[in-house]
Structure formats: structure tokens, C-alpha cells
């Protein structure tokens, strides 16, 4: 590993990408401590046990409870991306047309997503500031008024726009997917505080139950290790489909008559479904705070509270649904079958074309079922465990956080590895 890290530093291009990414993350962390004007941030400390805001605060690296200019984080962008991707499924013909236009279409969709993020972010900023102030008994906003609320909403929206730009810069000039890296950094930044809370609760206040608390912490560590191993296994696992190439096929990637494999990941969607599910389940509750307490908003708060049995089921269902959705965004069976046919390749015992497409689709459905159930279980189990063990509420999203942190780390390592392999260096993973 140390040799691999040394290789990173030797290659100027990779070294510059890593340094650029780190500098952007430093900017992100600094922005998390710049407060929004006209806000008494001390009031928010009383709200840190509320799960809806706790999960947003974790993803933002503490920016929410600081009510900083980056308080909303990147969630409005993720929500906008979900909606735009769903609308591409023959809901909005123009979006569907753009999605089939290659790079040009992707640029148009990306630009529209940016605009939609600004609109969505502004609405969410108004709802969040108004709702937070109501929950704090009017003590959060020091100078309440239409002008103040508009100013706060503009500042928060600008913060989200800045993070969106920052993520794009990391993607273009740094390492990994910029948006995922920002979420990764936010989660990692909050780990010391969570550890400190667990230590204070389990050891400092343990009294004559210290031994029992030690056993509990050991169980927690074993559970974390099991989750880490499980996530790595699922993220790396592939199903190899045997592919044969006809003799005399000039376009095949291997000599005619030989066989190769088409690898399909057990979880081709990665951690994106979890991020999407978090954005989807927190947005309604955040917006509901704008309308105060009534039967409808109380129902929304209950339904989308992932610590409540109903909300837990909704959260798991969202993860499963988004895993299927994004798996077929990442893997296109029709395109795969078409490419194999053009290259003279076929699955033994299966006709090229439609039958090959159906076989790949069937395999992908089964693989995604395993991957989606795994993601849902890992995200939900820690919530149950925390409630049973009486751990701090900040640990409730431990499974979700681990999924994202490990998933993003693996994807980033793969990208760095590919950069090293191109330059004839050996990477992290053995081949």
C-alpha cells in the first residue's frame, strides 16, 4: 500500500489531482463554519436529537447545526438529479430526446439540473429557515421579516450552488465523483463527534456498569467490521457471463472461436441509491416544517421518519427502488446485446439479439435483488441496533454512512488505480 501511495506522488498528474481535491475539501470545510447573517446558531444545539436534521447535518459535516452558508449541503442538487432522471423515462419527451443524444444531450440535461437545483434549493431554504425558527420558538432568526427570510434563502441557495460547482470542479480536475466526495468528506468530518458522544455515554456515565458498556462497545466494533467486510464484498462481487465469439469475426475483442466473460456487478448502482433515498426521505420533512404542525404535516413527518417503523419501511423501499432504477441506468442490456451482436459475440445456448438482451436483463434483475436487499438491510439494521442498545441518535445513520464512505472510497481507489495502470504502475488491488 505504501508503495502504491508513493507511486501516486511520483506521477505529477495524479499528484496534482489529489492535491486539488484536498484543497477543494478544505474550502468545503471552511465554508461549513461561516454562519448565515441574522441567525442565532446557539439555538440549534437543542435540535441535534431530531433525526431528520441529524442526517442532513451528518452529510454536511456539521454545517446545518452551524447554520452556515453551506447548511443545505448538496441535497437540493441530488433531489433535482433524481427528478430529472425520472422525467427522462418518457415523462417529458424533450428530456427523453436529450438523454439519447450522447454528450450534447447530457450537457443540456446537466444544465437544466443546475437551474432546477437553484429553484428547489431556494424553496427548501425558505422552508428550512422558517421551520427552524418556528421550532425554536422564534428565537433562531434575530430579525424576522420578509427581507431577512429572503436574504437567508438567497445565501443558503448560493451555498448549495457553490457546492454544486465545487463538486463539478473535483470531478473535472480532481479525483473521483465530486458530489460523492463532498458527501464523503462531510460524513468523515462528523465521525470524531459521534465517537465522542458514544464514549461519553458508554464510559464516562457508565458508573458500576462499566464492564457491560465495554462489552457493548466491543459488539459495536464487531458489527462495524462485519458491515465493512460485507460492503466491500458486495461492491466488488461480479457475476461473469460466458461469451463466445464466432470465428472470422473481425470486430471481436478476442480472436474468433475463443471465449471471454461479460462481468456484471452484484450491485452496479453502487451507493447512489442510498444517497438518493436519503435525499428523497428528508426533503418532504424539511418542506413540511414550513407549514407548521397540522394533520397533514404530522403524517408526513411520521411517514418519512426513518426511525419510525413506517418510515423505516419507506426508507428501505426507496433504497430497493432506486437500486433497480439506477442499475438499469448504469447497465443497458439492449445496448450490451447489440454490441455483442455487432462484434460476433454470443452467450452459449442463447440467440444473439432480443434473446441475449432478455438473458442479460434476467440476470441483472436477480443480481440487483441481492444488492438492493443488502443495501436496505445495512441501512436499516443500525437504526434498530441503536434503539435497542440506547446509543446516541447520531449513530443511527451509521449503516448509511458506512455504505457511502466505503462505496465512495472503493470507487475513488479504482479511479486512481486505473490512472496508475495506464502508466505501468501497480495499484492497490491485485489482478
Swiss-Prot record:
List the subcellular locations: Cell membrane
Q: Name one GO cellular component term.
A: plasma membrane
Pfam families documented for this protein: SecY (PF00344)
Output the GO biological process annotations, alphabetical, semicolon-separated.
Answer: intracellular protein transmembrane transport; protein targeting; protein transport by the Sec complex
Q: What is its main location?
A: membrane
- This protein's source sits in the domain of life called Bacteria
Note the PROSITE patterns from the entry: SECY_1 (PS00755), SECY_2 (PS00756)
The membrane-topology field of this record reads:
Multi-pass membrane protein
Q: Which UniProt keywords apply?
A: Cell membrane, Membrane, Protein transport, Translocation, Transmembrane, Transmembrane helix, Transport
* Membrane-crossing residue ranges in chain numbering: 18-38, 64-84, 116-136, 146-166, 175-195, 214-234, 262-282, 309-329, 369-389, 390-410
**Oligomer status and interactors:** Component of the Sec protein translocase complex. Heterotrimer consisting of SecY, SecE and SecG subunits. The heterotrimers can form oligomers, although 1 heterotrimer is thought to be able to translocate proteins. Interacts with the ribosome. Interacts with SecDF, and other proteins may be involved. Interacts with SecA.
The entry sums up its family as follows:
Belongs to the SecY/SEC61-alpha family.
Described purpose of this protein according to its UniProt entry: The central subunit of the protein translocation channel SecYEG. Consists of two halves formed by TMs 1-5 and 6-10. These two domains form a lateral gate at the front which open onto the bilayer between TMs 2 and 7, and are clamped together by SecE at the back. The channel is closed by both a pore ring composed of hydrophobic SecY resides and a short helix (helix 2A) on the extracellular side of the membrane which forms a plug. The plug probably moves laterally to allow the channel to open. The ring and the pore may move independently.
Q: What is this protein called?
A: Protein translocase subunit SecY
Its source organism is Bacillus licheniformis (strain ATCC 14580 / DSM 13 / JCM 2505 / CCUG 7422 / NBRC 12200 / NCIMB 9375 / NCTC 10341 / NRRL NRS-1264 / Gibson 46)
The organism's taxonomy opens as: Bacteria, Bacillati, Bacillota, Bacilli, Bacillales
Amino acid at each position: 500500500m505504501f508503495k502504491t501511495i508513493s507511486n501516486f506522488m511520483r506521477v505529477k498528474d495524479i499528484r496534482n489531482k489529489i492535491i486539488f481535491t484536498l484543497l477543494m475539501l478544505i474550502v468545503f470545510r471552511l465554508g461549513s463554519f461561516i454562519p448565515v447573517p441574522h441567525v442565532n446558531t446557539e439555538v440549534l444545539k437543542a435540535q441535534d436529537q431530531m433525526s431528520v436534521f441529524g442526517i442532513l447535518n451528518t452529510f454536511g459535516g456539521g454545517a446545518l447545526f452551524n447554520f452556515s452558508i453551506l447548511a443545505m449541503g448538496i441535497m437540493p442538487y441530488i433531489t433535482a438529479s433524481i427528478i430529472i432522471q425520472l422525467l427522462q423515462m418518457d415523462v417529458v419527451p424533450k428530456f427523453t430526446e436529450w438523454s439519447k443524444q450522447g454528450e450534447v444531450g447530457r450537457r443540456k440535461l446537466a444544465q437544466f439540473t443546475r437551474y432546477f437545483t437553484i429553484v428547489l434549493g431556494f424553496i427548501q431554504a425558505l422552508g428550512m429557515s422558517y421551520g427552524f425558527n418556528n421550532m425554536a420558538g422564534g428565537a433562531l432568526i434575530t430579525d424576522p421579516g420578509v427581507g431577512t427570510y429572503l436574504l437567508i434563502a438567497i445565501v443558503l441557495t448560493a451555498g448549495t450552488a457553490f457546492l454544486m460547482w465545487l463538486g463539478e470542479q473535483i470531478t473535472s480536475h480532481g479525483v473521483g465523483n465530486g458530489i460523492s466526495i463532498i458527501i464523503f468528506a462531510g460524513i468523515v468530518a462528523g465521525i470524531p463527534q459521534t465517537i465522542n458522544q458514544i464514549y461519553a455515554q458508554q464510559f464516562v456515565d457508565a458508573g458500576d456498569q462499566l464492564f457491560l458498556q465495554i462489552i457493548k462497545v466491543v459488539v459495536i466494533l464487531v458489527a462495524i467490521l462485519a458491515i465493512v467486510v460485507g460492503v466491500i464484498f458486495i461492491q466488488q462481487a461480479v457475476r461473469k457471463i460466458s461469451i463466445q465469439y464466432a470465428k472470422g469475426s473481425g470486430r471481436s475483442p478476442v480472436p474468433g472461436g475463443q471465449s471471454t466473460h461479460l462481468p456484471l456487478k452484484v450491485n452496479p448502482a453502487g451507493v447512489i441509491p442510498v444517497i438518493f433515498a436519503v435525499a428523497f426521505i428528508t426533503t418532504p420533512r424539511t418542506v413540511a416544517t414550513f407549514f407548521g404542525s397540522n394533520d397533514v404535516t404530522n403524517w408526513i413527518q411520521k411517514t418519512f421518519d426513518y426511525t419510525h417503523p413506517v418510515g423505516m419501511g419507506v426508507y428501505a423501499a426507496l433504497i430497493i427502488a432506486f437500486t433497480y432504477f439506477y442499475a438499469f441506468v448504469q447497465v443497458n442490456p439492449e445496448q450490451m446485446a447489440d454490441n455483442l451482436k455487432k462484434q460476433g459475440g454470443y452467450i452459449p445456448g442463447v440467440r444473439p439479439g432480443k434473446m441475449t438482451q432478455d438473458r442479460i436483463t434476467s440476470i441483472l434483475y436477480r443480481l440487483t435483488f441481492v444488492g438492493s436487499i443488502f443495501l436496505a438491510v445495512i441501512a436499516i439494521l443500525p437504526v434498530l441496533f441503536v434503539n435497542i442498545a440506547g446509543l446516541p441518535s447520531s449513530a443511527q445513520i451509521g449503516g448509511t454512512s458506512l455504505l457511502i464512505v466505503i462505496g465512495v472510497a472503493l470507487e475513488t481507489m479504482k479511479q486512481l488505480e486505473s490512472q496508475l495502470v495506464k502508466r505501468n504502475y501497480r495499484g492497490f488491488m491485485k489482478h
